[in-house]
């Protein structure tokens, strides 16, 4: 039997490599005559660690270098945390597969002296670390008395900063903590009523060349239908709002019978304005549900909030 070969482009961070190795193992397990290799590299978002993500102002912070490898023929696919993948992709590339989603929730991680608290009971002035404007806006809206501070670096670096006493607690994606073996550090899964998660959070997205039918067939073995439907609705919502991965837009999606329900939120960075609504529709047309919800939020002023945020970062 002829050996098939596939090369994956991946970020070099520990979490990215854990995720990419999982994809490699699953593909080789499902396709016995497939040989998968990995080309890892640092992206712009990995290199710039002294500036808040939103201030860098690039929608492809963690993806551009991987996409370049595919476009010049040095890689067949790229594995991304789907939440980092922009909704508009370069010409010639497409989102070929969405894997089964891990828990998409945000999680509270605390240092030892704060183990007696939940997020809702943290004392006024507690220092909360997050690099996400989405988390920041929602938490400021709910808990204006807390002190929020930007935190950069990979998951392990952030936990080290927390344990050294620089922060009282930090907010991270539950999925990343679980994949890295830090599930025991999850002190609280943050309820949707407090913080809606990022678009695509918890799922992996496999990007490939649009016309590469052989590769599309190979990666299709990892496609999870329900996860894909939810994430496509979420990505359609984000695309319609013309938001990027770093703006204060949150979502939560669920499927019951043949209906998909999508909740969405847009907030100002200071947490003073927050618009939330939901939309539902046939699970066969998830992108229509996302578009419908975006239109509902636009009618309530979401456009104005996002324009003010983009203007704010253009001025800096």
Curated annotation (Swiss-Prot):
Q: How is the cofactor bound?
A: Binds 1 dipyrromethane group covalently.
Q: Which UniProt keywords apply?
A: Chlorophyll biosynthesis, Porphyrin biosynthesis, Transferase
Q: Which cofactor does it need?
A: dipyrromethane
Enzyme class label: transferase
Q: What is its EC number?
A: 2.5.1.61
- Molecular function in Gene Ontology: hydroxymethylbilane synthase activity
S-(dipyrrolylmethanemethyl)cysteine modification sites are 245
Per the record, the pathway is: Porphyrin-containing compound metabolism; protoporphyrin-IX biosynthesis; coproporphyrinogen-III from 5-aminolevulinate: step 2/4; Porphyrin-containing compound metabolism; chlorophyll biosynthesis
Give the GO biological process terms: chlorophyll biosynthetic process; protoporphyrinogen IX biosynthetic process
Q: What else is known?
A: The porphobilinogen subunits are added to the dipyrromethane group.
The name this protein goes by in its record: Porphobilinogen deaminase
| Source organism of the structure | Prochlorococcus marinus (strain MIT 9515)
């Amino acid at each position: 039997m002829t050996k098939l070969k596939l090369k994956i482009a991946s970020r070099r961070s520990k979490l990215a490599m854990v995720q990419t190795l999982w994809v490699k193992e699953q593909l080789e397990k499902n396709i016995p005559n497939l040989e998968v290799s990995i080309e890892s590299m640092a992206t712009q978002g990995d290199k710039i660690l002294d500036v808040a993500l939103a201030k860098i102002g690039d929608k492809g912070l963690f993806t551009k270098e991987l996409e370049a490898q595919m476009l010049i023929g040095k890689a067949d696919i790229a594995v991304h945390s789907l939440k980092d993948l922009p909704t508009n992709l370069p010409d010639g590339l497409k989102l070929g597969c969405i894997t089964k989603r891990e828990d998409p929730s945000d999680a509270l991680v605390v240092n030892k002296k704060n183990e007696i608290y939940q997020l809702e009971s943290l004392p006024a002035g507690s220092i909360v670390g997050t690099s996400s404007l989405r988390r920041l806006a929602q938490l400021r809206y709910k808990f204006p008395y807390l002190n929020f501070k930007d935190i950069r670096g990979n998951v392990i670096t952030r936990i080290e900063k927390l344990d050294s006493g620089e922060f009282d607690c930090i907010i991270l994606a539950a999925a990343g903590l679980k994949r890295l073996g830090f599930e025991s550090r999850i002190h609280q899964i943050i309820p949707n009523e407090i913080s809606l998660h990022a678009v695509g959070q918890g799922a992996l997205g496999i990007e490939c060349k649009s016309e590469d039918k052989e590769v599309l067939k190979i990666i299709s073995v990892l496609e999870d239908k329900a996860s894909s439907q939810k994430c496509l609705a979420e990505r359609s919502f984000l695309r319609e709002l013309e938001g990027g991965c770093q703006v204060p837009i949150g979502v939560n999606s669920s499927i019951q019978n043949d209906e998909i329900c999508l909740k969405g939120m847009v907030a100002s960075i200071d947490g003073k304005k927050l618009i939330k609504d939901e939309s539902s529709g046939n699970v066969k047309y998830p992108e229509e549900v996302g578009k419908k919800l975006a239109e509902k939020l636009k009618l309530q002023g979401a456009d104005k909030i996002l324009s003010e945020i983009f203007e704010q970062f253009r001025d800096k």
